[in-house]
């Protein structure tokens, strides 16, 4: 024992003197030295390495380093070091290098010499220069001779302007990330050499206007988190290939006009200032900055006319007060639509003439008024009623979130009367104050949380085979026994959370498919008797007035998860816990 104690200092010194590269994980062609405390390039590594990871270390330079054995290296990751200097002599020893990741270093220092050294990297296809405090001219100098470059990451720098000649030497660039900079200006012709460019990320910048957008070959464009008030595309004859466009978190006042963007499938306009979807509503005085391009706005053409392939449209978090149904008629491929968190008060079916005023409100033929939407999000608006024609015009609707509105479900006393009450009607009865959720045959998932619903009427969901129903947050809600009639064989998930219901207000029927039930945040002292025939797998009864779960738990063979906290369970009646 004494001998081991005597030898311990020598053993520890030997461990400290080991080369840091011995801590690396190595295979024949791949080596990872992430975060092992390296202060210099590990030249002692073996021959034939193609993939080398050196991120999260303390390497400061790659200058005049003799690096034998790295002639086969194709991938080098040096992100999150302290790198500030490189030499052509060193980089010339990496003739096959294709991916060079240098994010989060100090390449703003010595950028002239470093950029000159980069000229020997003739085979570089992927380059990461993110988070290096690079200004516009510095970034341009680094890539000034990289003719093979395909993917470039310049995010998280200090670029304020994209100059006309910045990308002159990188004609094969396909992906460009300029997010999280300070870009305020894009000079005319800045992207002109990039005829193969497909993906551009300009999120988190300070761009106010995109006019004459002419990158017809682009497929993905992210302009979120800017200060955009205006977005217009070039009115040329060549169609655009753009498929994904993100304009969220800007200051757009109107739906952008995209007359030639026929292939667009995903459009995100959330978190803007759009107050109207009506054609011809553009006013110069609404804009913070003056734009000469305002005169190009077409005041009669619907901006959605060309978007025949659009599948996903997000207009949430805007200022819309009206849901003009006909605005979406030309979107024949639309599957997902969100108008959540607006100021919607009503839905309107009218067509528009002269670009401004509602025309004849009489019903249009069904094939012209139906939308192909499968998922509709209208939560957090001010809707008080949805007319019968609304659901009739959405024959493919499967999922809808109508939470945080003021919608009251209508009564339907059985299938025959429910059909007579409006199954085939296109015009709501004047003075309607409730919304018919019956006879919606494709609807599977419905959320009515926080709608101030106090009572469900009998057969409210007749001929609507719901799989999930959210009625949470409707304080003092009453659910009489017949309210969930016709859902006995379909409903799998039900939430009645936070309704302050006692057992007299929760008369659930025998729901033979119910697997998930949330009853938390009520005043139940007894569980609904109808649950005895439900194959429950998950039950949440937290924060109620229950003293026992009794026979429900002891007889259930399917129950896997029960949440019980916040109930005054009696210590003398906990025998069911052993079952």
Question: Which residues does each PLM region occupy?
Answer:
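Consensus "Asn ladder" position of solenoid repeat domains
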Residues: 36, 57, 78-81, 102-105, ...
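LRR N-terminal entry segment and analogous cap-like coil->beta motifs
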Residues: 26-64, 70-73, 134, 284-287, ...
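A structural signal for leucine-rich repeat
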Residues: 44, 65-70, 88-94, 112-121, ...
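Membrane-proximal C-terminal cap and juxtamembrane stalk of leucine-rich repeat ectodomains
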Residues: 1-18, 23-31, 126, 134, ...
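Conserved LRR concave beta-strand detector
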Residues: 30, 51, 72-75, 85, ...
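Ankyrin-repeat and related helical/solenoid repeat scaffolds used for protein-protein interactions
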Residues: 515-575
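Leucine-rich repeat
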Residues: 39, 60, 84, 108, ...
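Tandem repeat protein-protein interaction scaffolds
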Residues: 64, 68-74, 84, 98-101, ...
């Amino acid at each position: 024992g004494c001998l081991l104690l005597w030898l311990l200092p020598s053993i520890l010194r030997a461990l400290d003197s080991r080369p840091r590269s011995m801590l690396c994980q190595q295979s024949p062609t791949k080596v990872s030295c992430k975060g092992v405390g390296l202060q210099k390039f590990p030249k002692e590594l073996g021959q034939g390495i193609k993939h080398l990871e050196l991120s999260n270390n303390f390497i400061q330079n790659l200058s005049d380093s003799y690096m034998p054995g790295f002639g086969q290296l194709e991938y080098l990751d040096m992100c999150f070091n302290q790198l500030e200097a490189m030499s052509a002599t060193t980089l010339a020893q990496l003739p096959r290098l294709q991916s060079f990741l240098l994010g989060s270093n100090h390449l703003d220092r010595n950028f002239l010499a470093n950029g000159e050294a980069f000229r020997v990297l003739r085979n570089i296809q992927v380059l990461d220069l993110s988070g290096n405090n690079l200004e516009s001219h510095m970034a341009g100098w680094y890539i000034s001779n990289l003719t093979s470059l395909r993917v470039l990451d310049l995010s998280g720098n200090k670029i304020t302007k994209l100059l006309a000649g910045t990308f002159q030497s990188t004609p094969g660039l396909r992906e460009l990330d300029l997010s999280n900079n300070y870009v305020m200006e894009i000079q005319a012709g800045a992207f002109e050499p990039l005829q193969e460019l497909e993906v551009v990320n300009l999120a988190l910048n300070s761009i106010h206007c995109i006019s004459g957008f002419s990158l017809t070959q682009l497929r993905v464009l992210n302009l979120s988190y800017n200060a955009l008030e205006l977005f217009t595309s070039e009115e040329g004859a060549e169609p655009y290939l753009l498929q994904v466009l993100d304009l969220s978190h800007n200051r757009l006042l109107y739906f952008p006009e995209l007359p030639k963007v026929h292939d667009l499938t995903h459009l995100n306009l959330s978190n803007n200032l759009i107050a109207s979807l009506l054609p011809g509503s553009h006013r110069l005085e609404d804009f913070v900055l003056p734009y000469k391009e305002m005169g190009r706005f077409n005041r009669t053409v619907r901006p959605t006319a060309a978007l025949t392939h659009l599948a996903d449209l997000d207009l949430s978090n805007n200022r819309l007060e009206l849901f003009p149904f006909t605005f979406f008629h030309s979107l024949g491929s639309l599957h997902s639509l969100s108008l959540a968190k607006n100021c919607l008060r009503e839905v309107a079916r009218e067509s528009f003439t002269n670009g401004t005023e509602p025309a004849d409100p009489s019903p249009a033929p069904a094939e012209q008024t139906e939308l192909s939407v499968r998922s509709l999000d209208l939560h957090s608006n001010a809707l008080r009623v949805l007319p019968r024609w609304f659901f009739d015009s959405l024959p493919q609707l499967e999922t809808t979130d109508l939470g945080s509105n003021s919608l009251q479900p209508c009564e339907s006393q059985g299938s025959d009367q429910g059909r007579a009450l409006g199954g085939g009607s296109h015009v709501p009865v004047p003075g309607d104050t409730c919304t018919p959720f019956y006879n919606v045959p494709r609807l599977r998932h419905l959320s009515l949380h926080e709608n101030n619903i106090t009572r469900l009427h009998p057969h409210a969901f007749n001929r609507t085979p719901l799989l999930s129903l959210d009625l949470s947050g409707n304080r003092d809600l009453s659910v009489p026994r017949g309210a969930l009639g016709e859902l006995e064989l379909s409903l799998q998930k039900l939430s009645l959370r936070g309704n302050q219901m006692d057992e007299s207000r929760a008369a659930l029927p025998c729901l033979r498919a119910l697997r998930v039930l949330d009853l938390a945040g009520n005043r139940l002292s007894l569980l609904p008797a109808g649950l005895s025939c439900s194959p429950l797998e998950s039950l949440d009864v937290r924060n109620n007035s229950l003293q026992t779960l009794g026979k429900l738990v002891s007889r259930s063979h399917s129950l896997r998860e029960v949440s019980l906290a916040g109930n005054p369970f009696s210590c003398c009646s906990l025998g069911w816990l052993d079952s």
